[in-house]
Each structure stands twice: as C-alpha cells, then as structure tokens.
C-alpha cells in the first residue's frame, strides 16, 4: 500500500453511479438496431403486393410509350388497328352484320374473328370512343386513324382490364400460398411476355386469361358452377381458351363422380351441364335470333388459314424445312388433332385418376403447350396460354418454370422486332438476370441455353442479312424455342406420373 502511495502515477479512482432508470435507457438505446422489414413475413404480403404493383404500372406505362403493332404502316396497319376497327364496326352496324362481309364491313380488312364477348367488349369501347371523339370510330373513314389522344385511350383500355380481370385471381393465389416467396411472386406478376404483347403489340389477352385464372380459383375451391360459367365467358372472349378446355372438363368430371353415389354424381354433372349450356345460349342469343350464328362460327374457326402465322415456335413452323417435303396437305388437320391429343393425354389421364390441384396446374400447362406446338392456326401470342398456368407452378417447379418463362420471352422477340420494339430485349434480359440472381437452384445448363437464345435475338437485330434465307434468324429462334417447348411438355408429362407414384 505504501509503495502505491509513493508512486506518483497512481491516483484514487472514483466511480460515478448512474441513476438505474437512466442507465437502462442508455443500454437500450445502444442495443437498439435499425428495423429491417422482412418481406418474406406473411404479415407483409400487402406491402410486397403494393411494391410490385407500383413497379408493374411503371413498366406498363413505359412499354405503352413504344410503337404498337402496324403503327404508321398502311394499308393494313396491325393488331392495334384491328381492335379499333372492331369498335368502328360494332358501334356503327347492326349486330347481324358484325361477322358478315358487306359494303361497310370488308372481312378482308380485319374482319371480326373472335367470339361474341369480344364483340360486345369492343362495342362498349366503341360507344365510349364515339362519345369522346366521333372521328375515332367513323364508319370507313376512320381506317388507320392515329393520334396521341386516341393512343392514350387505347393504351388505357388495355391496362385497366389487366387490373380488373387478370391481377385479382393471380394475387389471391399467391398471397394464400404457403410456399409464396416475394421474389417468385414478383416474377409471376411482372412476367414480360404478357405485358409486351398487351401493352406494346396491343391486345386484350389479360381479359380471357384473367377469366381463366378466376375459373381455376373457383373450381379448386369447389365453386364448380361459378367456375364453369367463368370458363364459358373466357372461351367466348377468345376461342384459344380451348387450349384449357380439356383439363377443365376432366377436372370437373373427375371431381363430380362419386362411385358410392352414382345418382348424385349424375345429377351434379347434369346441373353443371345445364348452367354451361344456358350461359352459351345467353351469350349467343343475339346471333341465334338473327340467324347469323353459323357465320360467327366460320369466322371464329378459320381452318382455311393454315397451321401457323409468321415464324412461330410451333412444331409445324420450326420443322417446316422437313415437313414441307412431305405430302401432308390433305391430312394435316387430322395429324394436327392426333398430335394435340397425344401430347395432352398423359397429364389428362393422371388428372382424371387423381384430380388434385397440383395435377390440375400441371395438366393446364402441358395441354396448353401441346396445343401451341401441334394445333391449327397458331400465333406467337398463344404461348401465353401455356405460360400463365405455368406461373401457378412456380413454387413447386421453380427451376423449370423460370427457365420456361425466359424461353417464352425469347420466342416472341421476332414479333417485337416486327413492331419496331426491339427495346423489349432489354426488358427480357433484365427479367432473366433478376430471375437467376435471386432464386435457387441455378442450373448452369439453363442459363447457357437462355444466353444462346439471347444471342439469336441479337443476331436478328445486327447479324448479316442472307438473301437466300431472309428469315434465317427468325426461323432459328422458332426452332430453338420449339425444341425447348417439346422438352417442357415431356417433362411435365413424366412429372404427372411421378406424382401418381408418390400418392
């Protein structure tokens, strides 16, 4: 002790005692960390949805500023003019003349070739157009009409139904899914091909696809009659919903049959059938009363227009360099039908035996692919009928579905180039980067094949022209995409049976 006192360096230490309450506050303040919102938490579903919708609307508006199909390209223009022309026809002519060739309705100039609900929808838009500016829908003289105000109206007419028909069932599905991941949720809602086709090229696919998604939601929740009515509405908006008709029919039939109560099963099926027939009659009543129903059917199912349009990634186009050497003209429609049924049969068989929700989703996607690959009069846009049900499988088959969605984006690029919207490639590439940066597992083989697809797209833009084969790059894209689609169809067909073994 004496030594310490002698040591001048040593000084007594005094400890200041803090107020206990104050010290607790200091400790709590130091230990307090910045709050981080966990978007994967179920309680934050609304925040995730709002965030995605804000990004989605920005994308739609940005896409809408780009050229539309056939912009300033007389005499036929494009799909944008087709939609405007149908408003012109329906609002100016009596209903019995909508599908008939006549003085004021030249069917060779974008004649109406979709079912009645499409016609009714365009009549409603035509009435609104007529009230805003009569020049937009003046009979004959409005052909090829283009203006900034009219383009704004048309673009909004495609965006609004997306939020009314398409998004609600899709959001309902994902927000109630136990496996819902925010990134997968975002990838599903921001799927580029639908946005580019509806808001760029210009169509109203979101209406029929939204009705289809609503059909799925109601059928899987055992509201069979409502689901059946909604599907009839989807089918009568766009006849391409026939792609989904077989799985919908098989699912309803399989779930309605009860071996222990055959009479009740028969009564249930009969009731559903009556509602379906009744809905069809109501929709078609004006054409039945005017005796023009047959003319509508002829326009809606144009078997004389060939197996495909443009350079589409269907089997018939992709392998045309072989098929055109075979004498198939007289039997091609029968071969087409047989191939569609063969491609659909495996998943449909399992669906009938095991009508689970997952198998329903698999069958909808597989059958959609089978129709796209092998059916009659296929367009690039019809790949959406396989892609949208695939969105419902993104949680279960993440790697496969993300690969598939990226290939579908590549498959429609030739259509975008035709519309002078090559900038869409940047959107597709951004989607590819995000989809593989934030999801797992990442398969190198998938990434490499997608990069090959992008290389083909770049060649289509900047590659040297070939006078002998002027469409070589478009055909390369079609072949590349078609081979992938065949693989996806086979994979889903085998996946159906694997599920059967487990169950």
From Swiss-Prot:
GO terms for molecular function: dolichyl pyrophosphate Man9GlcNAc2 alpha-1,3-glucosyltransferase activity. Adds the first glucose residue to the lipid-linked oligosaccharide precursor for N-linked glycosylation. Transfers glucose from dolichyl phosphate glucose (Dol-P-Glc) onto the lipid-linked oligosaccharide Man(9)GlcNAc(2)-PP-Dol. One of its GO terms (cellular component) is endoplasmic reticulum membrane. It is a multi-pass membrane protein. GO terms for biological process: dolichol-linked oligosaccharide biosynthetic process. Pathway: Protein modification; protein glycosylation. The chain crosses the membrane at residues 47-67, 152-172, 182-202, 212-232, 240-257, 269-289, 333-353, 360-379, 383-403, 421-441, 444-464, 475-495. Belongs to the ALG6/ALG8 glucosyltransferase family. It catalyses: an alpha-D-Man-(1->2)-alpha-D-Man-(1->2)-alpha-D-Man-(1->3)-[alpha-D-Man-(1->2)-alpha-D-Man-(1->3)-[alpha-D-Man-(1->2)-alpha-D-Man-(1->6)]-alpha-D-Man-(1->6)]-beta-D-Man-(1->4)-beta-D-GlcNAc-(1->4)-alpha-D-GlcNAc-diphospho-di-trans,poly-cis-dolichol + a di-trans,poly-cis-dolichyl beta-D-glucosyl phosphate = an alpha-D-Glc-(1->3)-alpha-D-Man-(1->2)-alpha-D-Man-(1->2)-alpha-D-Man-(1->3)-[alpha-D-Man-(1->2)-alpha-D-Man-(1->3)-[alpha-D-Man-(1->2)-alpha-D-Man-(1->6)]-alpha-D-Man-(1->6)]-beta-D-Man-(1->4)-beta-D-GlcNAc-(1->4)-alpha-D-GlcNAc-diphospho-di-trans,poly-cis-dolichol + a di-trans,poly-cis-dolichyl phosphate + H(+). This is Probable dolichyl pyrophosphate Man9GlcNAc2 alpha-1,3-glucosyltransferase. It is found in: Endoplasmic reticulum membrane. Residues 1-46, 173-181, 233-239, 290-332, 380-382, 442-443, 496-503 are cytoplasmic. The lineage of its organism: Eukaryota, Metazoa, Ecdysozoa, Nematoda, Chromadorea. Its EC number is 2.4.1.267. Residues 68-151, 203-211, 258-268, 354-359, 404-420, 465-474 are lumenal. The keyword Secreted does not apply. Pfam families: Alg6_Alg8 (PF03155). It comes from the Eukaryota. Keywords: Endoplasmic reticulum, Glycosyltransferase, Membrane, Transferase, Transmembrane, Transmembrane helix. It is an enzyme of class 2 (transferase).
